[in-house]
């Protein structure tokens, strides 16, 4: 079992059930982001020295969602990525970025778009849209920490979670419960380890495309058309 917390989130599970029931037709495009609140302390610079890069560290959760909603058998056709250091230029010494966009085209006619950021001013903003041939689903499109809106002379204020933990706290609890159930009662796990490995592999390819500035291409078996450049 691997700790992809979004698979244990009630909203993502509800969205998956709707996809499974055919409510949006054939899922064709997935647009997903992991955006952290800006931390000016320099933590992310030190962290980048061993994290594997923004796509391996952050987008891996969005990639796992892609394998969940599109099917774990999907094969990349091309991978492109672009990034910048808008607020933390010291990340460059680790070949990392505080904002990055990645696009993965799959051989079965599906596309995934990922956005990662470490400079959100307001708080944690993790959003996903699954666009199908007959409809669309969104998860957390309007982030909120709770159901309270504060109405005042300047407008309406709604708080959002400050951290990843704040957004997925209950998912972490459920994940622990299901892991314990699997250990004690031999209940089925909600994912296979091979899917986790595949998510990390795609994340590593995105990071390679980001650092090299090159588009990566694959044949229909998933084999690289050309060798790695980094």
Feature roles, as predicted:
Residues 31-33, 136-157:
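Mobile, glycine-enriched helix-loop/loop "lid" segments at the mouths of ligand-binding/catalytic clefts
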């Amino acid at each position: 079992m691997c700790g992809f917390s979004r698979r244990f989130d009630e909203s993502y599970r509800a969205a998956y059930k709707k996809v499974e029931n055919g409510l949006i037709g054939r899922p064709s495009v997935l647009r997903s982001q992991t955006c952290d609140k800006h931390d000016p302390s320099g933590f992310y610079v030190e962290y980048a020295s061993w994290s594997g890069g923004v796509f391996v560290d952050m987008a891996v959760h969005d990639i796992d969602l892609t394998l969940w909603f599109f099917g774990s058998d999907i094969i990349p056709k091309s991978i492109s990525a672009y990034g910048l250091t808008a607020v933390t230029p010291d990340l460059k010494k680790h070949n990392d970025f505080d904002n990055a966009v990645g696009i993965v085209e799959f051989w079965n006619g599906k596309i995934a778009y990922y956005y990662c950021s470490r400079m959100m001013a307001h708080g944690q903003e993790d959003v996903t849209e699954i666009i199908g041939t007959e409809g669309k689903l969104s998860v957390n499109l309007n982030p909120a920490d709770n159901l309270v809106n504060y109405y005042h002379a300047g407008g309406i204020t709604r708080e959002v979670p400050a951290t990843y933990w704040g957004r997925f706290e209950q998912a972490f609890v459920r994940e622990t419960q299901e892991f314990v159930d699997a250990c004690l009662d031999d209940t089925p796990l909600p994912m296979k380890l091979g899917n986790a490995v595949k998510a990390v592999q795609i994340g590593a390819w995105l990071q390679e495309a980001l650092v090299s500035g090159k588009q990566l291409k694959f044949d229909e078996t998933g084999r690289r058309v050309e060798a790695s450049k980094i």
